Structure formats: structure tokens, C-alpha cells
């Protein structure tokens, strides 16, 4: 027991080690043996005397030196036990103090941990806020880019609208001029209306004249057919007369010159095979409307006051001069 070396307690303690906290070291006031600790108290004077002269001095009790040595050793061990008890008490007090300090340190550590957790929560909140701000900033930047593109588009639209406005201004100017001309033309509308009314009246009169001429043409066409049949009959009779005259002339040449029996007169000279027909002494019993000559599809009859009957009857010429049937020339 005298050779024990009581140094500082080990660093590892119950409850774990905590960084930043160092347990206080309790140093006993004296340590037996070789340890380099504090200086022990001086021994008892009797022991000093015994150590100086052990072989020459006898114990007062009359004991031999060996028993006195054992007794001294027991006393020393008793003293060591007392010292160990004192050390144990001091260690118990130190343990209680360390335990209290540990509780305080744990409480402080918990407070620090809570503070660290709060700091971490605040840091996370700040990081989230910063992230949200960065996201909002990025969205705002994108919106700014979109707004820039839209502004450029708006500027292009403004240029187009400006050019369109100029074109519309020129068109409005032209339309104003056209409106002025139309206004001048509108002022002439009453005159044009009067002219249109006059033209309508003339057209109605022309239609009435055309209807009248249609009726007259139908009547004249029927009358012309009758006259045609009569003329054909007269032409046949004239041919017969010509044949008879030719036969009589032939017989007269054969019999010699004789007078003209019957007093027949020949027109155009003697010996002319085509005797001239006399002019028609009869005038037609209808008159021509001078407005009818300009009507499209109108064919005047092949007779009238200007027609002179001369020469033989030509059926082909009569067919060419014959007007179309009623209903085809007037539509």
C-alpha cells in the first residue's frame, strides 16, 4: 500500500467525454512511495531516534527491535489507511463536485445544442429564403427577358402601325378626293335623273311606235302577198301577150309590111324583146313611219312609191326581197 502512486484521474469518466470541458484534477496532499509528489510530513521523533540507533537502543516496553519495527509498520499502515480514508472522502467530494459540474456541463451542452439547432433552423430558414429569393430573381430575370422580347415586338408593331397609318392617311386623302368628286357627281344627279326620265319616255314612245309598226307590218305583209300573187298572174299574162305579139310579128314579117292592127303601141323601140312595163299608177294605201327604218330586224316591203315595174318578173329576186315571217325578225 505504501508503494501506491495516486496521480490524476483518467480522462474517460462515466457519462462520456465532452469536447471543450476538462475535469478538474484533485491532487492529494501527500503520496507515499516514489512519485515525485508533494513532500510528506516529517516522521515522529521517536521514529527518528529508532532509525538512528536501532541496534543500541531497547524499547521502553522491553520488546525486541523486530516487534518494534512491526509495530511501527502497523502504525504506518494505520496512518496510510487514515490518509486513504481522507483521500477517499476528498475523492467522494471531488466526485460529487465533478458530478455537479458534469450536470452543469450537460445542461450547458444541451443549451448549446438547442442553440446550435436553433442556429441550424435559422440557417435553413435563411437558406430557404435565399433560395426562394434566387428563384424569384431568376423568374424575374426570365420575365424581364420575355418583356424585352415583347418590347422589341411592340416596337416592330409600332413601326408597322406607323407605316400602316401613313398608308391609311394617303388612302384617306385619296378617298377625300374621291368623295369630293362623288359629291360633285351627286349634284349632277337631278340632271341625270331628268335625262333618264326623258330617255324612258322616248323609249316608251319608241316601243309604242315599234308595236304600231309591227301591226302595220303584219297588215302590209298580208297585203304584199296578195299583191305578189296578182303580179305573178299579171306577169304570166304579159308573157302570154309577148308570145302572141311575137307570133303576130313573125307572121307580119312573113306576109310583108302591114299597119299595126289594133293600134298596139310598143315601148322602148320596135323589135325590143323586152317591152317596158308601164309605171304603176296606183299608190299604196299605207304610209311608212320614218322611225321604223332604224329598227333592227325590220325589212321594208318590196313595193312602194319608189318601185318602178320594168323588165320581166324574177322569182329569185322576189324571194330575196321577201321579208321574214312574223315573229322571227322582231324579238
Swiss-Prot record:
> What does the UniProt function comment say about this protein?
Has no transcriptional activation activity.
Q: Which family does it belong to?
A: Belongs to the FLX family.
**Keyword Coiled coil set for record:** yes
Q: What keyword terms does UniProt attach to this protein?
A: Coiled coil, Developmental protein, Differentiation, Flowering
Q: Where is the composition biased (Pro residues)?
A: 322-331
Null mutant phenotype reads: No suppression of FRI activity.
How does the annotation summarize its subunit structure?
Interacts with FRI.
Q: Which domain of life is it from?
A: Eukaryota
Q: Where is this region: Disordered?
A: 1-51, 306-331
**Protein name listed in UniProt:** Protein FLX-like 1
Residue spans making up a coiled coil are: 69-252
Q: Which GO terms describe its cellular component?
A: nuclear body; nucleus
Q: Name one GO biological process term.
A: flower development
Q: Tell me if Aminoacyl-tRNA synthetase is a UniProt keyword of this record.
A: no
Low complexity compositional bias: what residue ranges?
Answer: 306-321
Amino acid at each position: 500500500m505504501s508503494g501506491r502512486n495516486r496521480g490524476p484521474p483518467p480522462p474517460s469518466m462515466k457519462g462520456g467525454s465532452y469536447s471543450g470541458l476538462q475535469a478538474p484534477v484533485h491532487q492529494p496532499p501527500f503520496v507515499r512511495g516514489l512519485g515525485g509528489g508533494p513532500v510528506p510530513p516529517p516522521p515522529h521523533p521517536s521514529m527518528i531516534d529508532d532509525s538512528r540507533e536501532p541496534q543500541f537502543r531497547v524499547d521502553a516496553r522491553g520488546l525486541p527491535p523486530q516487534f518494534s519495527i512491526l509495530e511501527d509498520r502497523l502504525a504506518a499502515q494505520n496512518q496510510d489507511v487514515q490518509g486513504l480514508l481522507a483521500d477517499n472522502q476528498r475523492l467522494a467530494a471531488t466526485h460529487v463536485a465533478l458530478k455537479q459540474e458534469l450536470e452543469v456541463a450537460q445542461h450547458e451542452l444541451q443549451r448549446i445544442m438547442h442553440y446550435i439547432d436553433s442556429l441550424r433552423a435559422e440557417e435553413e430558414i435563411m437558406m430557404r429564403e435565399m433560395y426562394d429569393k434566387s428563384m424569384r430573381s431568376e423568374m424575374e430575370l426570365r420575365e424581364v427577358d420575355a418583356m424585352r422580347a415583347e418590347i422589341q415586338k411592340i416596337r416592330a408593331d409600332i413601326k408597322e402601325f406607323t407605316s400602316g397609318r401613313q398608308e391609311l392617311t394617303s388612302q384617306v386623302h385619296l378617298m377625300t378626293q374621291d368623295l369630293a368628286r362623288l359629291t360633285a357627281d351627286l349634284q349632277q344627279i337631278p340632271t341625270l335623273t331628268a335625262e333618264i326620265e326623258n330617255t324612258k319616255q322616248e323609249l316608251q314612245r319608241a316601243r309604242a311606235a315599234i308595236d304600231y309598226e309591227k301591226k302595220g307590218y303584219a297588215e302590209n305583209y298580208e297585203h304584199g302577198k296578195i299583191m305578189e300573187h296578182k303580179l305573178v298572174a299579171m306577169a304570166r299574162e304579159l308573157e302570154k301577150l309577148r308570145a302572141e305579139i311575137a307570133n303576130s310579128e313573125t307572121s307580119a314579117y312573113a306576109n310583108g309590111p302591114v299597119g299595126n292592127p289594133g293600134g298596139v303601141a310598143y315601148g322602148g323601140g320596135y323589135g325590143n324583146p323586152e317591152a317596158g312595163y308601164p309605171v304603176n299608177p296606183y299608190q299604196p294605201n299605207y304610209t311608212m313611219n320614218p322611225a321604223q327604218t332604224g329598227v333592227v330586224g325590220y325589212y321594208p316591203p318590196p313595193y312602194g312609191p319608189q318601185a318602178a315595174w320594168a323588165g320581166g318578173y324574177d322569182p329569185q329576186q322576189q324571194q330575196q326581197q321577201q321579208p321574214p315571217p312574223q315573229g322571227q325578225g322582231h324579238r
